[in-house]
A protein has these predicted regions:
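Formylglycine-dependent sulfatase
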Residues: 4-386, 390-392, 401-422, 435-436, ...
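Beta-rich accessory regions
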Residues: 426-429
Length: 465
């Protein structure tokens, strides 16, 4: 049987803002349909809560510092290989439609089917899904990525179906008129994106290739609200991930196994009969290893185990982020129960576009609205913590899932903190991550040559801020 792969990628979407992950507000019937027919993964994580690093770790199976794509709008090192090499050499048609956010071209020899890099909200759909029909109806096996722009801001697909005044504000947000307005528009973007997933599923069904197609939906990193995107908190790093494979994945099932985006390509190679350990990724880690950072969770997909990873890792750099701090490197490690974070330049203030106070860009006024509308001192201090954080943070995720109660200075947790710190530093060493030194070099990893399709957009956006 010829196995085909299709990945549908959202953009800046919280993992829990869709029906399969508990939302009773946001209408996502097609994501739910995919979940009904496949397996939902409850503990999938990216290691960066920014678009370009997230997408490139998915495509390469490498963590960001090792690949070179660790700041936003960045590219991998020239020698790094991607899924396009591995599946192309196996005879696959490797194609992508929609948002790129990868480079250089030699590392991603992909048949690009077109699309825009940011949704303008005009002239109908921003992706012409008709262009995928020749790929999915052909005789060759295919690996197709449908890379969405939604629900990334600007939110311009309307907000009529979610009335701001009727929304219930989650406990990890501050209730303000601007919060309600933004959520209404953000939810509408998700429902619009869901409709495009529905159209994609219809195309696959029409050519009658569903039985031998692995269909995946993933939400990318978290939303562009405080404590989401641009952080190492779970609202930034946790992602929805649903896989359907008729006859191989049991319908309407869930897995609690812990995994990361770097595991996806090794898993899909394993699924088509390849040994992921035999691939040279083009860039060695500090021990000389040229294998993937990720490891296959094919046994989880087959329902043979609920065990995969014990720890996941996170990184954030503000270098090159629009309105970002000059230097605010963040590193994290997460077990099932605890999250440990180091803010390596904690004496600085944390900035990004959410804190910019730019009246021409409504998203940058949201943080100020949270300061003004906090209901009590405890909530106000939590909002202020977004900009001013200590060197260490430690959270009990089972009792504090939204990471509000920092345990790092409590003596009872000293041994737990030390153990997680050792694991974090071991991972950083293996990746060649020098902390602040790597942070300062991050700016040179950005696509400043104009190679990437999104480069001109970023330059225009910067000129307005």
């Amino acid at each position: 049987m010829c196995i085909r792969d299709r990945i549908f990628v959202g953009d800046d979407m919280n993992w829990n803002d869709c029906e399969p992950y508990g939302s009773n507000v946001v209408k996502t019937p097609y994501i739910q349909k995919l979940a009904n027919e496949g397996m939902s993964f409850d503990n999938m994580f990216t290691s960066t809560a920014m678009c370009a690093p997230t997408r490139q770790q998915l495509m390469t199976g490498l963590y960001p510092v090792r690949s070179g794509a660790y700041p936003n709008h960045s590219v991998v090192y020239d020698s790094v290989k991607s899924f396009a090499h591995y599946f192309g050499e196996l005879g696959y048609e490797v194609a992508l439609i929609g948002k790129k956010h990868y480079g250089p071209a030699d590392s991603f020899p992909i048949n690009y089917l077109g699309g825009v890099q940011h949704d303008t909200g005009i002239d109908g759909d921003d992706i012409d899904l008709g262009k995928i029909e020749p790929i999915v109806s052909g005789d060759k096996p295919f690996f197709l990525v449908i890379a969405q722009n939604q629900p990334h801001s600007p939110w311009n697909r309307g907000s009529d179906q979610y009335k701001a005044e009727d929304l219930t504000i989650p406990e990890y947000m501050v209730d303000s008129p601007m919060t309600r307005s933004h959520l209404s528009s953000y939810y509408s973007e998700i429902t619009y994106m869901d409709s495009l997933l529905g159209k994609t599923l219809d195309i696959i069904n029409k050519v009658e290739k569903t039985d031998n197609t692995i269909s995946i939906f993933t939400s990318e990193q978290g939303y562009a609200f405080p404590y989401g995107k641009w952080t190492c908190y779970d609202l930034g790093l946790k992602t929805a991930f649903i896989a359907k494979w008729p006859g191989r994945i049991k319908p309407n099932t869930r897995s609690k196994a812990t995994m990361q985006y770097v595991d996806i390509i090794p898993t899909l190679l394993d699924a088509v009969g390849q040994n992921p350990l035999e691939f040279d990724v083009g860039m060695a880690d500090t021990s000389g290893n040229k294998n993937f950072d990720g490891k296959s969770f094919f046994n989880v997909i087959k329902g043979e185990t609920e065990k995969h990873r014990d720890y996941t890792y996170g990184i954030h750099t503000t270098r090159g982020v629009i309105n970002g701090s000059e230097s605010y490197p963040i590193r994290s490690v997460r077990s099932k129960k605890y999250k440990y974070i180091q803010n390596l330049s904690h004496n600085n203030l944390f900035y990004n576009i959410l804190t910019a106070e730019d009246k021409q860009n409504p998203i940058s006024l949201l943080y100020q609205s949270w300061l003004k509308n906090a209901v009590n001192e405890e909530q106000l201090n939590w909002v202020k913590h977004y900009k001013k954080r200590p060197f260490e943070e430690l959270y009990d995720l089972e009792n504090d899932p939204y990471e509000k109660n920092n345990l790092a200075d409590q003596a009872d947790y000293l041994e737990i903190k030390k153990s997680l710190e050792a694991r974090l530093h071991s991972w950083m060493d293996q990746q060649g991550d020098l902390g602040i030194e790597s942070e300062m070099k991050a700016i040179y990893r950005q696509d400043r040559t104009g190679k990437g399709e999104w480069f001109s957009y970023i330059q225009k956006l910067k000129s307005k801020i």
